[in-house]
């Protein structure tokens, strides 16, 4: 039987993606041997979590993933959300182990956080239809999170590196709509 490892970083507040993933795990379990690996974004940050903000590679998460891979030996890794606790190092590990990667694109965060300057995020009307972001200056910093420049900077760096990972490593992208499909095609080389 094909083994599927579902990987997700749970949001602090339970939301649509988290509910969707649990539902999918149930459905997948009817046809495959499934293991669910969940990372949690909590307020209780450890030393390596702070480092991972800058490297986008979480040492503890990588260690956890390697142990699960050794114990479970999946054929497929089905990735939902890696922001930020899972980190981007998991793509390299999965690629090195020759595990097929499926990446589900749930929302438009990648598009909204792909640039440092707000003019590359918003339309000519200074408004983003995808996330509701409003900017009065097209040359201002792309403050994706209204309450934090730092969190916005970290999100932008993460998204830019995730887009590089999508381009670098072989994976199948599961998009929710044609807009996302076309958006991600511009980054995918294969």
Outline where the language-model segments fall.
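Short aromatic-enriched loop/helix-cap "lid" or pocket-rim segments at secondary-structure transitions
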Residues: 18-19, 46-50, 90-91, 113-118, ...
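Short amphipathic alpha-helical segments and helix-helix/interface helices
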Residues: 25, 66-69, 88-95, 160-167
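An aromatic- and histidine-rich active-site surface loop
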Residues: 78-99, 103-137
